[in-house]
């Protein structure tokens, strides 16, 4: 089982030609993003209130779901 932060996983989505790739780029460009965080609620709250993200929160939900699956392997 992996023990990486969501930020680390999001970097693997950079370069995708979909909304998840766009979100990953926005996360990468956000210097204040909580890079060591794993908790869904803390990350979701940050994206909703602190970040300046143009992507729908449902895209974050989907990417976080991929993250939880990725951690299992």
From Swiss-Prot:
It comes from the Bacteria. This is UPF0346 protein SSP1318. InterPro entries: UPF0346 (IPR010673), YozE_SAM-like (IPR023089), YozE_SAM-like_sf (IPR036806). SUPFAM superfamilies: YozE-like. Belongs to the UPF0346 family.
